From Swiss-Prot:
The keyword Cell division applies. Residues 152-189 are annotated as: Disordered. One of its GO terms (biological process) is FtsZ-dependent cytokinesis. HAMAP family: SepF (MF_01197). Cell division protein that is part of the divisome complex and is recruited early to the Z-ring. Probably stimulates Z-ring formation, perhaps through the cross-linking of FtsZ protofilaments. Its function overlaps with FtsA. InterPro entries: Cell_div_SepF, Cell_div_SepF/SepF-rel, SepF-like_sf. Residues 152-163 have a biased composition (Polar residues). This is Cell division protein SepF.
Length: 189
């Protein structure tokens, strides 16, 4: 180094004037085994990397909460026969825990049962779940991680539709409903 560059470094406040630097700010690689040929201590290197993961906040305070019940465990089905609407939050909690819920609402009054179905259907919709009517006053509600398939759809066949006039089976093309506004209004022309 020349005299002018040393003088410039002193005036500018260069800390590395003599090529020395403070090693206290840097971590050493003592965690790794330096005696290996490079590939023998792979698992301990991964363990050291996983411990240094900045996204792993096990002990820290994180504001992110997870969905309860997310795991690779077997699916669970909860059968509920509520007698009042007050028991419906239990069904929502079961859905949040990724459990499939079967509601048997035969023990409830019809207006309370309708209210219960609407409540649980709203909760199911909120978690992107599925709902299916299984039978008379029996409903299946499943979270998004469960696929619900229905192999039997209740669709009326053409032979089961009855005509009001001749009380016999008719095809669906004949049964086109007449609009309510045109049936009873006499023409004024």
């Amino acid at each position: 180094m020349s005299l002018i560059s040393r003088l410039r470094a002193v005036v500018a406040g260069d800390d590395y004037l003599d090529g020395d630097f403070d090693e206290l700010d840097y971590e050493t690689g003592d965690d790794f085994d330096t005696g290996n040929d490079g590939g023998g201590n792979y698992s301990s290197g991964l363990a050291a990397l996983s411990n240094a993961n900045p996204f792993n906040n096990r002990g820290g305070s994180s504001k992110v909460i997870g969905m309860p019940g997310i795991s690779t465990a077997a699916a669970e089905v909860s059968l509920m026969e509520p007698r009042s609407f007050d028991e419906m939050p239990k069904a929502i909690q079961a859905l949040r825990e990724r459990k499939t819920v079967i509601l048997n609402l035969t023990m409830m009054e019809p207006d309370q049962a309708q209210r219960a179905v609407d409540f649980v259907a709203g909760g199911t919709f909120a978690i992107d779940g599925h709902q299916e009517r299984v039978g008379e006053s029996i409903f299946l509600f499943a979270p998004s991680c469960v696929t619900v398939t229905n192999s039997f759809q209740e669709e009326p066949s053409p032979s089961s539709v009855m005509n009001k006039d001749n009380e016999g089976p008719v095809s669906e093309s004949v049964m086109a409903p007449e609009p309510a506004w045109g049936a009873s209004v006499p023409s004024a022309i």
